[in-house]
């Protein structure tokens, strides 16, 4: 049985990934989450009946700090790391960018530093955003090799974390995969996220703000 780490497991994307792992793998899953306001506590993972699955281990930890030795020992031999944890509310990144950027960059650096010590790591998957490329001109489709053109501190923090991931792949030969996801929507999403917020504002007859060029 493979052992995997999923960061941000209580978040919107993270808990859907966790649900998929539970249903479609036999993995032992170690969930690392600091339980920020966007995590909704354990409500999301409680809704998918995680606490009755002995394969799932949940740890409350802040990845802005290096992993503690006790936790590292308990995690043991890890095969895959799925790094999903991040602050992602664009408006919050604009109103208070410093802690926002520090969280997303430092958490990625610390989980990478832990991961590079693992002797049997098969894959490190980092979940980034398409927003690192900025707004595309009409008729243009971006490719992975495009230059970053971050339009706000949120996308800049994800772009910086991507660069750190790439540097660890190049320097230490780590097996890193980076995904650039678009806006997501689904069950149990935080009401402050873009699509739920837009829907709510439209229903209330309010002005919709879109951060774009």
Where are these regions (language model features)?
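N-terminal Rossmann-like NAD(P)+-binding domain of SDR-like oxidoreductases, especially those catalyzing
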Residues: 1-184, 204
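Glycine/proline-rich active-site loop of Rossmann-fold NAD(P)-dependent oxidoreductases
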Residues: 159, 177, 184-197, 204-206, ...
């Amino acid at each position: 049985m493979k052992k995997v780490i999923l960061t941000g497991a209580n978040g919107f994307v993270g808990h859907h990934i966790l649900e998929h792992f539970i249903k479609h793998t036999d993995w032992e899953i170690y969930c690392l989450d600091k339980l920020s306001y966007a995590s909704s506590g354990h409500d999301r993972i409680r809704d998918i009946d995680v606490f009755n699955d002995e394969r799932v281990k949940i740890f409350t930890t802040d990845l802005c700090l290096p992993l503690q030795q006790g936790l590292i020992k308990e995690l043991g031999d890890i095969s895959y790391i799925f790094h999903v944890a991040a602050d992602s509310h664009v408006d919050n990144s604009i109103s208070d960018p410093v802690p926002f950027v520090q969280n997303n960059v430092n958490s990625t650096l610390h989980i990478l530093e832990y991961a590079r010590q693992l002797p049997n790591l098969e894959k490190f998957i980092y979940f980034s955003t398409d927003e690192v490329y900025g707004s595309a001109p009409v008729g243009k489709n971006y490719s992975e090799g495009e230059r970053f053109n971050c339009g706000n501190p949120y996308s800049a923090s994800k772009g910086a974390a991507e660069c750190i991931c790439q540097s660890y792949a190049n320097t230490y030969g780590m097996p890193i995969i980076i995904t650039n996801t678009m806006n997501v929507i689904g069950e149990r999403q935080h009401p402050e996220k873009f699509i739920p917020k837009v829907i709510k504002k439209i229903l209330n007859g309010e002005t919709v703000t879109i951060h774009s060029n």
